[in-house]
Amino acid sequence: PFLSGRQQPEEENRLSLSPITNKHIMKDLRTRHTALLLFTFLLASVSLSAQTGLQQKLSEISAITETQPLESTEFSEKYVTYFTQPLDHRHPEKGSFRQRVIVAHAGFDRPTVIITEGYGAAYALKPQYREELSRLLNANMVFVEYRYFLESTPEPKDWRYLTAESSADDLHAVTTAFKNIYPGKWIATGISKGGQTALLYRTFYPDDVDVSVPYVAPLCYGTEDGRHEPFLKKVSTDEDRKRITDFQL
């Protein structure tokens, strides 16, 4: 009787505390649930805000079907994108291909350099790559791989669409789209065949860019130019020229 008398108040205390304890537990669960919802909302907000910059703007260009981030020691952001281009810009119904375009970001208020590459763009993927004018002007960089080279090769390869005018049409489409992101001054530049491409781009679309800077721009007179042969027939010695000819054959 003595022990049962001492146990009874403890049981009563437990029973009397139970509603309070349950209330605290429910309140704690509601607090945790609210905190979890708030954290989820903040996380979603951060993810959304992370894409309100260049990446978000790239996603708004309908011609871009794929965007991948690239490492860069020169720019705050760098991406390789794949831009849908018609094989024939005058007749889009004839098909399309994906053109590789590399974008490097210096600032929305900065000028933009479009590199009119004459061949492939693989070297521009390197983290340390930065074109000279882009460095000098602290400018954005839009690097366009030439059609029918590397990852910008149509399938099947219908060579009728590999023309200077089609290349200029490609550059015009890229520039027009990216001016929605970079509305400042634009500079077109290229080296060798890329320089030739910059000149031809200016010829077909004289108002697309503010400045054209071709670094070397060989302009051919035709499929057979006619200016190289006289020089090659005289340079060096007969023996050396034959050796080079034999090596090529």
Give the predicted meaning of each segment.
Residues 209-249:
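A catalytic-pocket lid/entrance helix-loop region that shapes and gates access to the active site
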Residues 1-53, 235-240:
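Bacterial Sec-dependent N-terminal signal peptides
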Residues 182-192:
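Alpha/beta-hydrolase fold nucleophile elbow
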Residues 161-179:
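Alpha/beta-hydrolase active-site loop
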Residues 195-206:
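Short glycine-enriched nucleophile-adjacent loop
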Residues 119, 145-149, 218:
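Short beta-to-alpha linker loops that shape the active-site pocket of alpha/beta-hydrolase fold enzymes
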Residues 51-140:
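Catalytic-loop region of hydrolases
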